[in-house]
Amino acid sequence: MQNINPTQTAAWSALEQHKADNLNIPQLFAEDANRFDKYHLNFEQQILVDFSKNAINQKTLELLRQLANECGLASATEAMFSGQKINRTENRAVLHTALRNRSNTPVLVDGKDVMPEVNAVLAKMKDFCERIISGSWKGYTGKAITDVINIGIGGSDLGPYMVTEALRPYKNHLNMHFVSNVDGTHIAEVLKKVNPETTLVLVASKTFTTQETMTNALTAREWLLAAVKDESAVAKHFAALSTNAKEVAKFGIDTANMFEFWDWVGGRYSLWSAIGLSIALSLGFENFEALLSGAHAMDNHFRTAPIEKNIPTTLALIGIWNSNFLGAETEALLPYDQYLHRFAAYFQQGNMESNGKFVGRDGSPVTHQTGPIVWGEPGTNGQHAFYQLIHQGTKLIPCDFIAPAQTHNPVGDHHAKLLSNFFAQTEALAFGKSKETVEAEFVAAGKNLADVAEIVPFKVFTGNKPTNSILVQKITPFTLGALIAMYEHKIFVQGVIFNIYSFDQWGVELGKQLANRILPELQNAEKISSHDSSTNGLINQFKAWR
């Protein structure tokens, strides 16, 4: 990948000047009755992305596309797909796209085609899923598996949990449970719900040394052995998603039930790999394959569609415009689908761990904004929580509204009411409500303007708040796969233009290092004085209270 400071490009300078045009969303619509037709894109007639309610015009998009070209987006995209080691700080390729490469076109890393290994793991996952789901796999007392606990953290938890929740209408009889936090409460509450005779535990850790995951895995192992008192039972109730065969065998897991992945799979992009075994178990392997197919279709779109028609690139460029030129610091992901209640949390990690960097690819601090703060909750819940600030606060918060046209649960008029709110919110954010409209409403209600003059300013909405509307025909494994891949590629595009490395995460290391130093200090009653006064005081109070 090239090392290009975006702020030194001609396009960046032109965008800085263009910012002075102070584009206004209501005015842009007033000037162009066909604005929607020009500012939306459609993916396979299943996902419609409307970006017309942003403060952009044709000039904005042309300059943003010029910025992408000047920053070498096209060559960076090919570098990723072709297996070049674009994760330079860890000297790794970035090939989550190969995991869902349904075409089987060879993908080379260091001259070796990775697809035979990818397909071998998928075949192994399929066979395992069929045995568990059919009931032919038996636990230590001869009973079939009814519950699956996935123990992992970060990408080994967030992705599988998000997808199994999002696709709950497709789930089979297996009950899925997810444990991530090293807080003993998390695993204790899950173990209360399950029977050791009929429970399968998946331990998801590439190295099989991750502190949180292995602490929880050992607790689950002790729980099983407390019931059966026979170490051979571990092999019938545990499987590993790992690459460390030695540690897996030492734990008591049969390495035949170890599902591998590779160092070119980043944790937050790993649900497509063996880490997705819990997804395949919950939904059935054919639905897992459909998820992969949807992502692969979006990969093909991203790789081949011209920049003017490219959905992930367009979303990425608009995001850069909003953050670096219009001053937005956050992005809200607002799915109007209760099944997608973990979608924002998933891409909170996906975006903030990828692009939350202050050092450019040249090793120097950047002078521009990089990744935004990403957050959100499902609609309509959020409307009664934080939308107040989005509508009338002093922060500019671009929002992505996501909704399915078809619901899995056609109960009464629930879905029509849900979608009426979905459509209304983006209209309200874009167009607001003027002082004149507020006054006219009071008059229509029979009020005397003199009597309500004091209240009028509080009912004004300025509008001009940017949103994208993403309307999905129906949330299926295919469309969810495409939707996830769309956001993955958006993050990639922004990282390329920000001139940062999106696929490392050194920011998680310092806290872990310090925690490893502090842990031994907590295992005695001695007063601590080895840290700053704040940390010493907190540790000593903890010791006094425990």
Curated annotation (Swiss-Prot):
UniProt cross-references to HAMAP family, sorted A to Z: G6P_isomerase
Protein name: Glucose-6-phosphate isomerase
Family note: Belongs to the GPI family.
UniProt GO BP: gluconeogenesis; glucose 6-phosphate metabolic process; glycolytic process
Cell location: Cytoplasm
Top-tier EC class: isomerase
SUPFAM superfamilies, per database record: SIS domain (SSF53697)
Chain's gene name: pgi
Entry EC number(s): 5.3.1.9
Keywords carried by this UniProt record: Cytoplasm, Gluconeogenesis, Glycolysis, Isomerase
CDD domains: SIS_PGI_1, SIS_PGI_2
Catalytic activity: alpha-D-glucose 6-phosphate = beta-D-fructose 6-phosphate
GO MF annotation list: carbohydrate derivative binding; glucose-6-phosphate isomerase activity; monosaccharide binding
Active site residues of this protein: 353, 384, 512
